[in-house]
UniProtKB/Swiss-Prot annotation:
A UniProt-annotated Pfam family: Acetyltransf_11
Record keywords, A-Z: Acyltransferase, Cytoplasm, Lipid A biosynthesis, Lipid biosynthesis, Lipid metabolism, Repeat, Transferase
Molecular-function GO term, any one: acyl-[acyl-carrier-protein]-UDP-N-acetylglucosamine O-acyltransferase activity
Annotated Gene Ontology cellular component terms: cytoplasm; membrane
EC number: 2.3.1.129
Protein's name in the database: Acyl-[acyl-carrier-protein]--UDP-N-acetylglucosamine O-acyltransferase
Subcellular location per the Swiss-Prot or TrEMBL entry: Cytoplasm
HAMAP family: LpxA
Biochemical pathway: Glycolipid biosynthesis; lipid IV(A) biosynthesis; lipid IV(A) from (3R)-3-hydroxytetradecanoyl-[acyl-carrier-protein] and UDP-N-acetyl-alpha-D-glucosamine: step 1/6
Reaction(s) the record says it catalyses: a (3R)-hydroxyacyl-[ACP] + UDP-N-acetyl-alpha-D-glucosamine = a UDP-3-O-[(3R)-3-hydroxyacyl]-N-acetyl-alpha-D-glucosamine + holo-[ACP]
Species of origin: Helicobacter pylori (strain Shi470)
UniProt KW Repeat keyword: yes
The gene coding this protein: lpxA
Species classification: Bacteria, Pseudomonadati, Campylobacterota, Epsilonproteobacteria, Campylobacterales
UniProt function note: Involved in the biosynthesis of lipid A, a phosphorylated glycolipid that anchors the lipopolysaccharide to the outer membrane of the cell.
């Protein structure tokens, strides 16, 4: 049975699942779908074509599905799709997509978005991610599963962050980050591997292989792209080579990499 506060303003066109809780002074628009077990604390605003997955909990003063902050947006149909078991904390803002992108903003399952996180239009975020307070994502960003982003970090539009990465707090990131890397700084560059996450997700032999692979990729000569091509030619069937090297070769913004920065950090860790 759903529990809905009397002061909540809910469109009769909204779809409300079973066991949904809606707190005081929430505002829910026409094209909202709340699946079973969703919990809205007080003063949550949901607008646009917004779909919230099961058991997601949204805290006070979050605004989801509001008009994209893009001057090119002219009111075209777009969506915000949020998966299951997410925690979206106070004052988060998440915008839907635009015609200039994929017309959707998508967030997976089991993510934690801490207070004041901003997710702009056309972003695609995986599952099991943690974004600390004040993280700001510009439009069209792609983020894989199991990514942690430290507080007050800003990320440029169209950046891609692959699975298992860690972005240090107060970073400004303008380039792509391949799988399992740690980046830090303004501008942020790769400092080493996210060994903590790798130990959670991978076997020891795979961690060792990836460590050696990155050392080969990040040599001063040949270039990073040439190194990635060579690795794919030499190890065409290895899943980690495919994942990492394909990501590098598909990068349009370039990879957040400096040979000296990576080498120095790796020496310290060893």
């Amino acid at each position: 049975m759903s529990k809905i506060a009397k002061t909540a303003i809910i469109s009769p066109k909204a779809e409300i699942g079973k066991g949904v809780e809606i707190g005081e002074f929430c505002v829910i628009g026409d094209h909202i779908k709340l699946n079973d077990g969703v919990k809205l604390h007080n003063n949550v605003t949901l607008q646009g074509h917004t779909f919230i997955g099961k058991n997601t909990e949204i805290f006070p003063f979050a605004a989801l599905g509001t008009q994209p902050q893009d001057l090119k947006y002219k009111g075209e149909y777009s969506e915000l799709i949020i998966g299951e078991d997410n925690l979206i904390r106070e004052f988060c803002m998440i915008n839907p997509g635009t015609e200039g992108g994929i017309k959707k903003t998508i967030i997976g399952d089991k993510n934690l978005l801490m207070a004041y996180v901003h997710v702009a239009h056309d972003c695609v975020i995986g599952s099991h991610c943690i974004f600390a307070n004040g993280v700001t994502l510009a439009g069209h960003i792609e983020i894989g599963d199991y990514v942690n982003i430290g507080g007050l970090t800003a990320i440029h539009q169209f950046v891609r962050i692959a699975k298992g990465c860690m972005i240090a707090g107060k970073s400004a990131l303008g380039k792509d980050v391949p799988p399992y890397c740690t980046v830090e700084g303004n501008r942020a560059f790769i400092r080493g591997l996210n060994r903590h996450r790798m130990r959670q997700l991978l076997e020891s032999k795979d961690i060792d292989f990836i460590h050696v692979l990155y050392k080969r990729l990040f040599r001063p000569v040949p270039s990073l792209r040439e190194s990635a091509k060579l690795e794919l030619e030499e190890h065409p069937n290895n899943p980690f080579v495919k994942e990492i090297c394909s990501f590098i070769l598909e990068s349009s913004r370039g990879v957040a990499y400096k040979s000296s920065e990576y080498s120095n950090e790796e020496k310290q860790e060893e």
